[in-house]
Amino acid sequence: MDLEIYDKTQDGVPAEHVNLIQDVLQYAGKYLKLADNTEMSVTLMNNEDIHRINQQYRGVDRATDVISFAIEDDDEEAADFPLVMDDELAAEIPENIGDIFVSMDKVAEQADYLGHSYERELGFLVVHGFLHLNGYDHMEPEDEKVMFKLQADILDAYGLKR
């Protein structure tokens, strides 16, 4: 998976945390059997910046821990003009699944509040956002069970246990 990580924090995110994000998302991509040419980005920021994004795009006037913006393929306008290509060429074109924004302030706050490691909380949030990019949600109780179990399975298999 082609993963771009952008650090927009003021103090800079330690390399070991950037590497953890890279590793856990690569692991999650393999766990879900995504194509090797799948693309996505993660932007690391502070509470102030994620608050602004949350307010602008979701209409919620507060900071949050993680926001995902999936790039969806069900665009009706695009469906009116189908692109026809052979399977070999189609396999070479990367699929961008979207972008994740993570508040590093919230990672620290929530790890402290929940009593687990900073690394566990960071892994939890990026996998949570990653699953949203891949069509999972928790709006309905049954969907929540599926998503949260998959999230726990990925984190446990990777080694980020509670």
Curated annotation (Swiss-Prot):
Supply the EC number(s).
3.1.-.-
UniProt key word rRNA processing: yes
Cleavable signal peptide = none
Q: Which InterPro entries match?
A: MetalPrtase_cat_dom_sf_prd, YbeY, YbeY_CS
What cofactor does this chain's UniProt record say it requires? Zn(2+)
The record's subcellular locations are: Cytoplasm
Molecular function via GO: metalloendopeptidase activity; RNA endonuclease activity; zinc ion binding
**Any one Gene Ontology biological process term?**
rRNA processing
Tell me the superkingdom of the source: Bacteria
* Family membership noted in the UniProt record: Belongs to the endoribonuclease YbeY family.
NCBIfam families the UniProt entry points to: rRNA maturation RNase YbeY
The entry's function note states: Single strand-specific metallo-endoribonuclease involved in late-stage 70S ribosome quality control and in maturation of the 3' terminus of the 16S rRNA.
Q: Kindly provide the name given to this protein in its UniProt entry.
A: Endoribonuclease YbeY
Q: Which organism is it from?
A: Levilactobacillus brevis (strain ATCC 367 / BCRC 12310 / CIP 105137 / JCM 1170 / LMG 11437 / NCIMB 947 / NCTC 947) (Lactobacillus brevis)
Lineage, highest ranks first: Bacteria, Bacillati, Bacillota, Bacilli, Lactobacillales
